[in-house]
Amino acid sequence: MLDVEAQEPPKGKWSTPPFDPRFPSQNQIRNCYQNFLDYHRCLKTRTRRGKSTQPCEYYFRVYHSLCPISWVESWNEQIKNGIFAGKI
């Protein structure tokens, strides 16, 4: 299982997330959630294969820029407890 408590933000300059054509409307809730899922899927896949998780930093930065902190904390708690509804 992934250790969601040990996640640290990547170093370097943070910028505004670029436009994502999958989410053209102003409402970015789905974009936030999808990037959260993509980040955890990326971590899971790359860790399992023994590869660097550095490419996953993009998703981390995007969901941390778009998602409210309370949502992220709630989702991480659900993952930790094994009750997260999303498919990771």
Curated annotation (Swiss-Prot):
Its main location: mitochondrion. Component of the cytochrome c oxidase (complex IV, CIV), a multisubunit enzyme composed of 14 subunits. The complex is composed of a catalytic core of 3 subunits MT-CO1, MT-CO2 and MT-CO3, encoded in the mitochondrial DNA, and 11 supernumerary subunits COX4I1 (or COX4I2), COX5A, COX5B, COX6A1 (or COX6A2), COX6B1 (or COX6B2), COX6C, COX7A2 (or COX7A1), COX7B, COX7C, COX8A and NDUFA4, which are encoded in the nuclear genome. Belongs to the cytochrome c oxidase subunit 6B family. A motif (Cx10C motif) lies at residues 56-67. It is a peripheral membrane protein. It comes from Homo sapiens. This is Cytochrome c oxidase subunit 6B2. InterPro entries: COX6B-like, CX6/COA6-like_sf, Cyt_c_oxidase_su6B. Residues 29-75 form the CHCH domain. Keywords: Disulfide bond, Membrane, Mitochondrion, Mitochondrion inner membrane. SUPFAM superfamilies: Cytochrome c oxidase subunit h (SSF47694). Residues 1-22 are annotated as: Disordered.
